[in-house]
Amino acid sequence: MKSSEIRQKFLDFFETHGHVVVPSSPLVPGNDPTLLFTNAGMVQFKDVFLGQDKRPYVRAVSAQRCVRAGGKHNDLENVGYTARHHTFFEMLGNFSFGDYFKRNAILFAWEFLTGPLNIPKDKLWATVYAEDDEAADIWLNEVKIAPSRLVRIATSDNFWQMGETGPCGPCSEIFYDHGPEVAGGPPGSEDADGDRYVEIWNLVFMQYNRDTSGELHPLPKPSVDTGMGLERIAAVMQQVHSNYEIDLFRCLIEAAARVTGEQDLSNNSLKVIADHIRACAFLITDGVIPGNEGRGYVLRRILRRAIRHGYRLGQKQSFFHLLVDDLVDVMGQAYPELMAAKKHVIAVIRQEEERFAETLENGMGVLEAALARESNMLPGDVVFRLYDTFGFPVDLTADIARERGGGIDLAGFEMCMAQQRDRARASGKFTMQAGLEYVGLPTEFHGYETLQHEAHILVLYKEGSHVDFIEAGDEAVVVLDQTPFYAESGGQAGDSGELLSGSGTFTVKDTQKIQAKVFGHAGMLSSGRLVTGDRVIARVNPIARINTAYNHSATHLLHAALRQILGNHVTQKGSLVDADRLRFDFSHNSAMQANEIRQVENLVNAQIRKNHEVATQLMAYDEAVKQGAMALFGEKYSDTVRVVSMGDFSTELCGGTHVQHSGDIGFFRIVAESGVAAGIRRIEALTGEAALAYTQQQEQQLQQVSDVLKAAPHEAALKLSQVLDHVRQVEKEITVLRSKLAGMQSSSLIEQAQEIKGIRVLAAALENVNVRTLRETLDNFKSRLKSCVVVLGTIEDDKVMLIAGVTNDLTAKLKAGDLINFVAQQVGGKGGGRADMAQAGGTLPDKLPQALTSVAGWVERNL
């Protein structure tokens, strides 16, 4: 049975049993700062389980795409080397929100496995939590499973909880027995880690709420959360022991072999590539782009790990993006969003491949040289240099070291990273601790109507932990029952301001969401003392709020203007709105032309001058979308949404704060347009007084340039062009002089050539020359010395440039490429080329003299 058939049978089975089929949510979870990626089927229903959201159904079924690579759930280092580890996988799940409980959950699972999937009953085992007599009774007396195949587990493996506090409950897991020919013991035994018994389905019974003291309280409406890995059940149905042998992976592994030229389909690198194309393609489909932090950096790590495994197979050209078509063929029908994003996915992956190719070979040279010097442990400073200079994620370096039988000095790397962070830390912005545990009332937001409101302190956090009070100088997070402070969301920065009480003043530096409707006010107690329960006056910084409103409303106008000028393919891919500026990322396949930027800028300013009323209204999500309101990337919307419109020009779903009339914005200037990834552009802009100040600064700079050029401002461009023409002429003359200088140096250097076994060998450094002159000088030496080996080096901008040449009569024994690599490794580089001529670069100029001295010995050893 194919993977696609299993997926569809699962959805159909539960739909016939009253479940609503809910599409997979994106891999970027909405409104959950504790998660990098969606890593289980229940993630999109988390607020339902917590009682913070209500759906129009009480039974649901889904096939959820998931990623585990980064954060708490990180399987990356095992992927490709084990039978069942993946970065991307599909979780089949059925859910009950206060409807059916243990009995139906167990009976549904048993019926599906033994009915539509036709798995023999005697191949299935079950586990229950040791104290869960109710579940055990259902298995024994209703399912009629043999008592010998029911195991009670006393460990936490069979008791699930969402966090230290909150919903939790016992589990019942279902295992498949591959038979006695496979090593391993049943669940709960000492050799349970073997491959004979494989867990295929986990049924979680959420029946308790754990309070801060650890005590369990029965939930009024117990719920069910189940999860079955599609890849695992497919392996069972297709009678294979490794997930990489199922139909879905066979197609991708064969495709990876095709594009890399690898013949051995069991090669682990092919498994890595096949796994990683799924994770990368779906992450990009869901709006993640390669970057240097957060989700973007995890994507970059996965991408570069796949590229390196291709390099390991001998594929030096871009290849990874070629697998997207094969992936769409396999999974596009189940996930039409992947098919729709195919061109964008290919473009993003290809760009990242090209970017990494620029440093991969040189980085590998540094790594190989370091591994050759060190026995088992790669020093932390080398790991950091590979990360910082060559773009090698630390786990990629660890992968390579492990393949060589060694490891990395992670502590040394972290020390280097800490030193870099200390150097870079300038802003000192307070950052909310991720994952603050909170159980209590939500925060009531009043910030649309007022900037000041009376409130009471519900909870205080200091250094990530709950405290009863804080004192002057303490950095803390304050949760209020009511607040006018806007919490960071939808790209808009959180408000700043102060909390005033009779006993202290708390300076709020930032406001962020701890949970969907719980606001954390982060900052420092400037004076006095605050205690849980204190009455405070919450006062938002009015200047920062209004400036942020200018920028947020301008962002809406910008979005609409881009769609009008560039086309309706433009969609928001990310944004940042604060008091100082706005940044807007959008889908577009090419850089904007100067005239397009001006058109967009003019259109936004025209809408500002029209002074539209900025209207807001609440309506049903479906109705808002029908009326043309744009839903934004990365946002999670409830059934009722807030719609912000400016005349008939812009209508968006938005929970942010805005001006009352578009004319309040005053003035809009685009200050930068750039690319952030393939198919994604970024505009940075200013509004109001900041835009005016920027314009005046530009005028001042133009006047300064004009003064230097001794020209009127309107003549500055022509005068500058004339100056540049003169500079180019001077540069040509310098090149001629350099060639003459090199010729003079070569006349004296040629006498330094030594003879080794009848061959003239010359290795020398030249001063004040560029690569072109090096090449010309090399050709001159080869012509004059006849049968010879020549290596020339020079230092420019603190970097080494090398070139090697071997006359044609010697290339059967001596290769210029081998020679240049030998020399380059000594100066921190790597190179390559033809047998008769090769080039390289390096980063250790002080090693150049010694490296050149070693050439004669290399020639003698290789003759």
Curated annotation (Swiss-Prot):
PANTHER family: ALANINE--TRNA LIGASE, CYTOPLASMIC (PTHR11777:SF9), ALANYL-TRNA SYNTHETASE (PTHR11777)
Binding site for Zn(2+): H552, H556, C654, H658
GO function terms (MF aspect): alanine-tRNA ligase activity; aminoacyl-tRNA deacylase activity; ATP binding; tRNA binding; zinc ion binding
GO biological process: alanyl-tRNA aminoacylation; negative regulation of DNA-templated transcription
Gene designation per UniProt: alaS
Family: Belongs to the class-II aminoacyl-tRNA synthetase family.
Protein name per Swiss-Prot or TrEMBL: Alanine--tRNA ligase
Cofactor: Zn(2+)
Known EC number: 6.1.1.7
Annotated localization: Cytoplasm
Entry remark concerning the domains of this protein: Consists of three domains; the N-terminal catalytic domain, the editing domain and the C-terminal C-Ala domain. The editing domain removes incorrectly charged amino acids, while the C-Ala domain, along with tRNA(Ala), serves as a bridge to cooperatively bring together the editing and aminoacylation centers thus stimulating deacylation of misacylated tRNAs.
Pfam families according to UniProt: DHHA1, tRNA-synt_2c, tRNA_SAD
First-level EC class: ligase
